[in-house]
Amino acid sequence: MSSLEISSSCFNQETKLPLSLPLVEGSTFEPPGKDMNEVEEKSKDIIKFTSEKLSVDEVSQLVISPLCGAISLFVGTTRNNFEGKKVISLEYEAYLPMAENEIRKICSDMRQKWPVRHIAVFHRLGLVPVTEASVIIAVSSAHRAASLEAVSYAIDALKARVPIWKKEIYEESSSSWKRNKECFWATSD
């Protein structure tokens, strides 16, 4: 008897699961080993800065857990306009040691406020063309309320605390560095 397989890989480990399991009439399926309620899984915080294009699928796969019924995502993309000017791309720079440290603190804050399992924060550096993602935040939790609230907190905290700078590049060959209005440590002009 042949069965279809679904293949999933994460951290260079591949797992194959049968699409459906054959059952004898009157029998029930019980997974081998531990009861599903006894599954132990270490929580993880995954932080990445890259000049490569970001993938929503890749980031969301990193936070999947058999203990979770919810994954919430925030995807920030480059829009094509600002105050009547046509934007062709954004350019991001960061002070990486401090940026990573601040994001780790944000992850810790999230864990104190909500019962979340896994957190992934990916941020693009360099040029980000219109419609492409500049930031993806994914959070998994047992229930949706925690992951939705946590992901909203994460993007607000990231914009307020993390040293990442954005330059808007306009169609008419001009550009402008932008300050996050939420950023607590930036001085006002």
Swiss-Prot record:
It is an enzyme of class 2 (transferase). InterPro entries: MoaE_sf, MOCS2B_euk, Mopterin_biosynth_MoaE. GO terms for molecular function: molybdopterin synthase activity. It is found in: Cytoplasm, Cytosol. One of its GO terms (biological process) is Mo-molybdopterin cofactor biosynthetic process. Pathway: Cofactor biosynthesis; molybdopterin biosynthesis. SUPFAM superfamilies: Molybdopterin synthase subunit MoaE (SSF54690). It catalyses: 2 [molybdopterin-synthase sulfur-carrier protein]-C-terminal-Gly-aminoethanethioate + cyclic pyranopterin phosphate + H2O = molybdopterin + 2 [molybdopterin-synthase sulfur-carrier protein]-C-terminal Gly-Gly + 2 H(+). The modification Phosphoserine is found at residue 20. It comes from the Eukaryota. Keywords: Cytoplasm, Molybdenum cofactor biosynthesis, Phosphoprotein, Transferase. Substrate binds at residues 143-144, 159, 166-168. Its main location: cytoplasm. Its EC number is 2.8.1.12. One of its GO terms (cellular component) is molybdopterin synthase complex. This protein is produced by a bicistronic gene which also produces the small subunit (MOCS2A) from an overlapping reading frame. Belongs to the MoaE family. MOCS2B subfamily. Catalytic subunit of the molybdopterin synthase complex, a complex that catalyzes the conversion of precursor Z into molybdopterin. Acts by mediating the incorporation of 2 sulfur atoms from thiocarboxylated MOCS2A into precursor Z to generate a dithiolene group. Heterotetramer; composed of 2 small (MOCS2A) and 2 large (MOCS2B) subunits. This is Molybdopterin synthase catalytic subunit. It comes from Bos taurus (Bovine). The lineage of its organism: Eukaryota, Metazoa, Chordata, Craniata, Vertebrata. The gene is MOCS2.
